[in-house]
Amino acid sequence: MPNAIAQFAGANYLNLETFRKTGVGVRTPVWFAQDVSHSAPSITVFYLYSEAGAGKVKRIRNNPRVRVAPCNMRGDVLGAWVDGRARICQNDEAAYGQQLLTRKYSLLKILGDFFSRLMHHKQTVIAVEID
């Protein structure tokens, strides 16, 4: 699946499709950072973050199956869909995911974090594993 993963290089957004209990997909464009130092080279991990109470977080808790594709800011898909499994990160992994996202988006991420804290919004880091 190297070509499927290569399509994300240089992309700023990925379209995350999570699934309702009915099986209907819900697509959301999100910022992401790829973990290129992952210990298993056959696994690609994308980190993203969201407000803890967001629908996508609730859907991931109910069903970890997701699909991702590179997209633009509006969510227009720019490549092929890839299947994956998502999980809510805790502790050190959440901090690592935040660090990768801050490194990629720098000032925009820092400002977003500031306003999230100001509004008392709790953030959740999500890892998406692609085999």
Language-model-derived ranges and their functions:
Residues 4-5, 45-50, 54-61:
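Covalent nucleotidyltransferase core used to form phosphodiester bonds in nucleic acids
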Residues 53-131:
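Short, structured beta-strand-loop surface elements
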Residues 1-15, 111:
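Extreme N-terminal tail/first-helix region
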Residues 11-52, 66-70, 79-82:
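Short beta-strand segments
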